[in-house]
A protein has these predicted regions:
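Conserved GNAT-fold acetyl-CoA-binding loop/helix
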Residues: 17-42
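A short helix-loop-beta-strand connector motif used in the catalytic cores of GNAT acetyltransferases and
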Residues: 42-55, 82
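Glycine-rich acyl-CoA binding loop
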Residues: 56, 94-102
Length: 193
């Protein structure tokens, strides 16, 4: 039986999470997934969602996922779709499910007037690279993906807060020395109230 590709709906979260975990295992990161069913429900089905999913359903079972979000190109002045995860259950592969999911995203891109559809692929995943080449996609050799997360992200956030706090403290100290933080013509009116 062929698969039906459709937007994810409430109630799909557990199946989606199962496929996310299977993808993580395939990508040699089986313990990396901390997302919960509740996280997926909160993000995929929020009043104004910022992440979306399409699923492929075969014989009443979800066997494929495409999880995506909108990004924006300042050069084209248009949104794009970034495909975060594409995965098909290995038992269901070879029946056009991945192609159907990508076609659904291409239709979303057209409906939303998006300039592009983009994603990242692991350097060792030759099977995926071959599939994407057959779609007509090309590897962008100019841009390298970079990421800041975990301790590095926290350290940057702390340094930004620290810098802002230092600047605020310096401003307050300067104002205290000068007696007012307001121009002389209005200082008396504001500082005395």
């Amino acid at each position: 039986m062929s698969a039906v590709v459709r937007p994810a709906r409430s109630g799909d979260e557990a199946d989606i999470l199962g496929l996310i975990r299977a993808l993580a295992a395939y990508e040699r990161e089986p313990d990396a997934v901390v997302t919960t069913v509740e996280d997926l429900r909160a993000h995929l089905f929020a009043d104004l969602p910022r992440v979306f999913a399409h699923v492929a359903e075969q014989d009443g079972r979800i066997v494929g996922i495409a999880i995506w979000f909108l990004n924006f190109s300042t050069w084209t002045g248009r949104h794009g779709i970034y495909l975060e995860d594409l995965f098909v259950d290995p038992a269901a592969r070879g029946s056009g499910i991945a192609l159907g999911l990508m076609q659904a995203l291409a239709a979303e891109a057209e409906a939303r007037d998006c300039a592009r559809l983009e994603w990242a692929v692991l350097d060792w995943n030759e099977l995926a690279k071959g599939f994407y080449r057959r779609l007509g996609a090309r590897h962008n050799e100019t841009w390298e993906p970079w990421r800041l997360d975990g301790a590095g992200l926290a350290a940057l956030q702390r340094s930004a807060v620290g810098d802002a706090l230092e600047a605020t403290e310096a401003t307050e100290a300067s104002e205290a020395r000068e007696g007012s933080r307001h121009p002389p013509e209005i200082a008396g009116m504001i500082d005395s109230s």
